[in-house]
C-alpha cells in the first residue's frame, strides 16, 4: 500500500492512495487574479502544465481563484467527481461538472475507499475547508492557509500538507500562517512527513499588492 504526493506549485497537488488519484486545487495554465481585478494582484505561470491523466477525484479547499482556477478546471472532464467547499462547489457547477459534493466543516463523505472529512479552514471571508483524508494506504491532513481546526483531535498521521511561511500585508496581518501553525501540526498529528505548500512553484506576481506582500520565515526555518 502506497501514499504518494506530487506538488504542482501554489496550492496544487496530486495525491495517490494506492491507485486512487486525487487532484487538489490545481492551477495548471493561464493567469490568476481575484474579484478586485488584475490591477491589484495578478499571478502568471511561466510554464503551463498538462492536466494529469486518469483522475478519480477533484478536491477543492476554497472557491477563490488560486484554489478553484476556472481556466485550469476547464481542462478536466466534466464527469470527474468533485468534493469541495460550498464556494468551490458553485465554481465547478458553473463550469458544468456533473457530480459535486459540497462539504461544510465537520461533514464527511466517502469516495472509493477514501474518507474525506472537511475541517474548518481559512476565513476568506467565509470559513473555507481543510481536509482530513483517511484511506487504507495512509492518512493525510491538508489546509492551505495555516488555519488549524481546534475541533480536530490529536491522532498520528502519515503526512501533513501545510504552508511553512507566513504571507501577509502591512496593517492587515498574515492571511497565510505557516510559521505559527507548523509546530501545532507536529504536536497534534506527529506526522511522518511534512510537505510545504502554498508559497512554492514558479509563479510571477504583478499589481499594486505585489510589492508590499510580506513573507516571513522559510521552509528551512519552520521545518
PLM feature spans:
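Zn-dependent metallo-beta-lactamase
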Residues: 1-44, 191, 209, 217
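Active-site neighborhood of phospho(di)ester-bond hydrolases with catalytic His/Asp-centered motifs
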Residues: 24-25, 55-68, 83-86, 141-146, ...
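Pre-active-site segment of Zn-dependent metallo-hydrolases
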Residues: 20-59, 70-72, 148-154
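Cap/insert and terminal regions of metallo-dependent hydrolase folds
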Residues: 87, 149-223
Amino acid at each position: 500500500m502506497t501514499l504518494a504526493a506530487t506538488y504542482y506549485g501554489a496550492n496544487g497537488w496530486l495525491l495517490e492512495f494506492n491507485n486512487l488519484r486525487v487532484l487538489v486545487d490545481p492551477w495548471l495554465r493561464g493567469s490568476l487574479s481575484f474579484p478586485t481585478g488584475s490591477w491589484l494582484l495578478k499571478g502568471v505561470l511561466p510554464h503551463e502544465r498538462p492536466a494529469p491523466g486518469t483522475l478519480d477525484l477533484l478536491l477543492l479547499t476554497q472557491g477563490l481563484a488560486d484554489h478553484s482556477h476556472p481556466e485550469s478546471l476547464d481542462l478536466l472532464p466534466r464527469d470527474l467527481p468533485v468534493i469541495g467547499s460550498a464556494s468551490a462547489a458553485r465554481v465547478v457547477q458553473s463550469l458544468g461538472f456533473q457530480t459535486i459534493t459540497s462539504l461544510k466543516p465537520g461533514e464527511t463523505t466517502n469516495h472509493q475507499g477514501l474518507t474525506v472529512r472537511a475541517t474548518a479552514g481559512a476565513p476568506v471571508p467565509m470559513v473555507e475547508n481543510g481536509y482530513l483524508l483517511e484511506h487504507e494506504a495512509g492518512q493525510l491532513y491538508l489546509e492551505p492557509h495555516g488555519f488549524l481546526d481546534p475541533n480536530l483531535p490529536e491522532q498520528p498521521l502519515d503526512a501533513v500538507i501545510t504552508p511553512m511561511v507566513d504571507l501577509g500585508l502591512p496593517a492587515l496581518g498574515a492571511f497565510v500562517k505557516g510559521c505559527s501553525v507548523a509546530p501545532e501540526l507536529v504536536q497534534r498529528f506527529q506526522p511522518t512527513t511534512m510537505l510545504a505548500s502554498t508559497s512554492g512553484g514558479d509563479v510571477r506576481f504583478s499589481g499594486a499588492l505585489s510589492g508590499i506582500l510580506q513573507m516571513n520565515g522559510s521552509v528551512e526555518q519552520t521545518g
